[in-house]
Amino acid sequence: AALTPEYQTKVGSAGKAIPKGKIKIEDPNENGEGEVLIKTPTLMLGYYEDEEATKSVIEEINGERWFHSGDIGYLDKDGFLYITGRSKNVIVTQNGKNIYPEEIELLLSHVPEIKECMVYGKEDEKDKSNKELIVSVKVIPNFEKIGKDLTDEQIREIIWPKIKEVNKKLTSYKAIKNLEIKHDEFEKTTTMKIKRYAEIKKNK
């Protein structure tokens, strides 16, 4: 979606948008960085017979269809794109299988004890030799349902069995392996989507 014109190059840049294409940065931070969104005349309609996967990468904004690249980057004053990282939205297993967090989050949204959640890929802290990411979930509990003044351990004892029930509906490689209890709100974009890359950065 980007190319570098022969007459104008910039070191480190991925280039400008292709002709008739558009690039924009979703909800940029103080450094102008955010997820790179792409619009082109040849943008795919979606993934074959996989509506959830399609929704995870293509969004209609003001009547235009935009592709969520999963890349984090910024545009300079001349419209050149610089890639600075990945949003790590899709979790890729060592066998090359893709896990879409939105699919798992949809199932978790039906759990009354969970107010809000974010699924992401995380390094296994118990096994540093294992480089494969495990499926982890950050959960904001529904305190109106489970009660207040509970310790994290008590909250875990309530919510983990619910997660195990959700895991039964998933293929084994998509199963949630780690639960994190979150007490503050998620950082969100102007369209009220969770800033995944910002939340993941907090773990580092």
Kindly give the residue locations of the regions a language model identified.
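Conserved ATP-binding/catalytic segment of the ANL
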Residues: 30-93, 101
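Conserved A3 ("GATE") glycine/threonine-rich loop of ANL adenylate-forming enzymes
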Residues: 1-5, 18-20, 99
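C-terminal boundary motif of the adenylate-forming
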Residues: 26, 70-72, 110-141
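Conserved C-terminal "lid"/linker of ANL adenylate-forming enzymes
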Residues: 118-121, 160, 164-204
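Adenylate-forming
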Residues: 43, 80-109, 143-153, 170-176
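Active-site loops of AMP-binding adenylate-forming
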Residues: 1-11, 50-53
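Conserved loop-to-beta-strand segment in the C-terminal subdomain of adenylate-forming
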Residues: 124-148, 168-181
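AMP-dependent adenylate-forming
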Residues: 80-84, 89-90, 130-133, 196-203
